[in-house]
């Protein structure tokens, strides 16, 4: 038995662990393949390792977070505000020459003056919207009480005028009650001075238009009175 074991020195024994890498030549392709010992324990990675940790740049700051730029607020004196408000009242959109002239008077830069005018115009628009917002919810009937000649009260309405009564013409003629002969027109009643009697209509009413003239029933000549 010992002779057989000595005759096969390259055969590995059972139960031994090979820690080295073995290179063998593949018989078909002739390429070299690497054999790794499968008995070595695989490396285990902890879950969450390296996740969520901020990366720091060589300068000491965190990567991916830009530094917030601090804004420099300009404080205006009372004299400067008075000059700016006066210029805003004259012109809300000054050109470059007006801004440079105002910069020399106030001692500010032209860019600061331009930003101030932009903020001032935005403030004015906001004030105008706040003043018009309560009036937008009111209906047109609300303003009827504030019209001249209307009774007091924002929600009062004027009563409609009474219907107009039609009366005869103010200068109507009195026709005689005597029957007229055929084919003749009835003459109006004449007063002592020879003019027809006129009766005005009651005041406060509109007169009706006069009736159309009546056509003669016959064309016979008028008969004289006996």
From Swiss-Prot:
Gene designation per UniProt: PROP1
Record's keyword annotation contains Acyltransferase: no
Cited function: Possibly involved in the ontogenesis of pituitary gonadotropes, as well as somatotropes, lactotropes and caudomedial thyrotropes.
Protein family membership: Belongs to the paired homeobox family.
Record field: compositional bias (Polar residues): 30-41
GO molecular function: DNA-binding transcription factor activity, RNA polymerase II-specific; RNA polymerase II cis-regulatory region sequence-specific DNA binding
Ranges annotated as DNA-binding: 69-128
Compartments it resides in: Nucleus
UniProt protein name: Homeobox protein prophet of Pit-1
Single Gene Ontology BP annotation: pituitary gland development
UniProt feature, compositional bias: Low complexity: 216-226
Source taxonomy: Eukaryota, Metazoa, Chordata, Craniata, Vertebrata
